[in-house]
Amino acid sequence: MIQQESRLKVADNTGAKELLTIRVLGGSGRRYAGLGDVIVATVKDAIPGGNVKKGDVVKAVIVRTRKNTRRTDGSYIKFDENAAVILKNDGDPRGTRIFGPVGRELRDKKFMKIISLAPEVL
């Protein structure tokens, strides 16, 4: 469950290390974001020489959450951290590598490029 002001780890090689959520996209009064949801965030921490700088406003998709996510078969999945992947305007990832596992829910939300780059899909 990601909401406004939530801090997330960045799971790609764009140069950003931490994001702060500004807004959850997908409805005027939407409060929470889960796996596969898109957010608007700002970069709070970045490495020098990266593609994104501290203070940049970016769109990102949630790939891991600490909160349990219920699946259609009745099972639940949760991760050890909250993480996101930074997106371009067309919905493709801005980085060329994804670090760590991602949820299968991204396949249902049509983020196939992230699924193909991820080392593990749970």
From Swiss-Prot:
One GO cellular component from the entry? cytosolic large ribosomal subunit
Q: Which Gene3D superfamilies match?
A: Ribosomal protein L14
Q: Does the keyword rRNA-binding apply?
A: yes
What Gene Ontology biological process does one annotation of this record name?
translation
Q: Which UniProt keywords are present, listed alphabetically?
A: Ribonucleoprotein, Ribosomal protein, RNA-binding, rRNA-binding
Query: Which Pfam families does UniProt cross-reference here?
Result: Ribosomal_L14
Name the InterPro entries on file: Ribosomal_uL14, Ribosomal_uL14_bac-type, Ribosomal_uL14_CS, Ribosomal_uL14_sf
GO molecular function per UniProt: large ribosomal subunit rRNA binding; structural constituent of ribosome
- How does the annotation summarize its subunit structure? Part of the 50S ribosomal subunit. Forms a cluster with proteins L3 and L19. In the 70S ribosome, L14 and L19 interact and together make contacts with the 16S rRNA in bridges B5 and B8.
Per its UniProt record, what NCBIfam families does this chain match? rplN_bact
What exactly does this protein do? Binds to 23S rRNA. Forms part of two intersubunit bridges in the 70S ribosome.
Q: Which family does it belong to?
A: Belongs to the universal ribosomal protein uL14 family.
The protein's name in its UniProt record: Large ribosomal subunit protein uL14
The UniProt gene name for this protein comes to: rplN
